[in-house]
Swiss-Prot record:
<dbReference type="InterPro" id="IPR018369">
    <property type="entry name" value="Chaprnonin_Cpn10_CS"/>
</dbReference>
<dbReference type="InterPro" id="IPR011032">
    <property type="entry name" value="GroES-like_sf"/>
</dbReference>
<dbReference type="InterPro" id="IPR020818">
    <property type="entry name" value="Chaperonin_GroES"/>
</dbReference>
<comment type="similarity">
    <text>Belongs to the GroES chaperonin family.</text>
</comment>
<dbReference type="GO" id="GO:0051082">
    <property type="term" value="F:unfolded protein binding"/>
</dbReference>
<dbReference type="InterPro" id="IPR037124">
    <property type="entry name" value="Chaperonin_GroES_sf"/>
</dbReference>
<dbReference type="GO" id="GO:0051087">
    <property type="term" value="F:protein-folding chaperone binding"/>
</dbReference>
<dbReference type="GO" id="GO:0044183">
    <property type="term" value="F:protein folding chaperone"/>
</dbReference>
<dbReference type="GO" id="GO:0046872">
    <property type="term" value="F:metal ion binding"/>
</dbReference>
<keyword id="KW-0963">Cytoplasm</keyword>
<dbReference type="GO" id="GO:0005524">
    <property type="term" value="F:ATP binding"/>
</dbReference>
<dbReference type="GO" id="GO:0051085">
    <property type="term" value="P:chaperone cofactor-dependent protein refolding"/>
</dbReference>
<dbReference type="Pfam" id="PF00166">
    <property type="entry name" value="Cpn10"/>
</dbReference>
<comment type="function">
    <text>Together with the chaperonin GroEL, plays an essential role in assisting protein folding. The GroEL-GroES system forms a nano-cage that allows encapsulation of the non-native substrate proteins and provides a physical environment optimized to promote and accelerate protein folding. GroES binds to the apical surface of the GroEL ring, thereby capping the opening of the GroEL channel.</text>
</comment>
<protein>
    <recommendedName>
        <fullName>Co-chaperonin GroES</fullName>
    </recommendedName>
</protein>
<keyword id="KW-0143">Chaperone</keyword>
<comment type="subunit">
    <text>Heptamer of 7 subunits arranged in a ring. Interacts with the chaperonin GroEL.</text>
</comment>
């Protein structure tokens, strides 16, 4: 199934945090931080919001950092994605 976000929304797939610390300690699921790094899976067309034209600055395949509690989580074909607005993306990782 293909997903096509509307407006200035993007669909991301979170990149899970490491399960082992640098010193080799294995973290249980409850101790891991909520992931804030993701890969862009789909990008909306942009559009006009509050009278301002919104140009999409991200593209499919970009790795990004996003606000920890941003967006709506959805499950499609057994895979978890998050749909959020471009404004919730903090940076592109190059």
């Amino acid at each position: 199934m293909k997903i096509r976000p509307l407006g200035d929304r993007v669909v991301i797939k979170k990149i899970e945090a490491e399960e082992t610390t640098k010193s080799g300690i294995v973290l249980p699921g409850s101790a891991k931080e909520k992931p804030q790094e993701a890969e862009i899976v789909a990008v909306g067309p942009g559009g006009v919001i509050d009278g301002k034209e919104i140009k999409m600055e991200v593209k499919v395949g970009d790795r990004v950092l996003f606000s920890k509690y941003a967006g709506n989580e959805v499950k499609i074909d057994g895979v978890e994605y998050t749909i959020l607005r471009q404004d919730d993306i903090l940076a592109i990782i190059e």
